[in-house]
Regions:
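Serine-hydrolase catalytic machinery in alpha/beta-hydrolase-like enzymes
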Residues: 7-95
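Short, glycine/charged-enriched secondary-structure capping and boundary segments
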Residues: 47-49, 110-113
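Glycine-rich nucleophile elbow surrounding the catalytic serine of serine-hydrolase chemistry
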Residues: 96-112
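Plant-biased recognition of short, low-complexity, intrinsically disordered N-terminal tails
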Residues: 1-2
Length: 113
């Protein structure tokens, strides 16, 4: 295997977000944060496959489950995940790319930080 899988619980208000990190077996530079669209969870086959592919090519990849349709809630969840990565001290990344799959067609929304 070209990467290691680590399960996480990320603080989000008075709850915890379920998350999985795929950590490449080489030095980290950039990370990618993925979540599902309005339905499903982080274990959707296309998210798992994408995360595995990215990690096998040297990208740190974190996917998480974010229940709820409210966009403000989802943005706060992304911010909590990003803050966790920045403050945990475990993962030193030069930058992070955020992505979300929406709809049946797997259309991707993304931004980078």
């Amino acid at each position: 295997m070209s990467h290691t899988e680590v399960k996480l619980k990320i603080p989000f208000g008075n709850k915890l977000l379920d998350a999985v990190c795929l950590i490449p077996n080489k030095s980290l530079t950039y990370g990618i944060i993925l979540t599902h669209g309005a339905s499903g969870d982080m274990n959707l086959p296309h998210l798992m496959s994408l995360a595995s592919h990215l990690a096998s090519h040297g990208f740190f990849c974190l996917r998480f489950t974010c229940k709820g349709l409210n966009i403000v809630h989802r943005i706060k969840a992304y911010k909590s995940v990003l803050n966790y990565l920045k403050t945990s001290g475990e993962y030193k990344l030069a930058g992070v790319f955020l992505g979300e799959f929406v709809g049946e067609s797997g259309t991707e929304n993304a931004s980078s930080q």
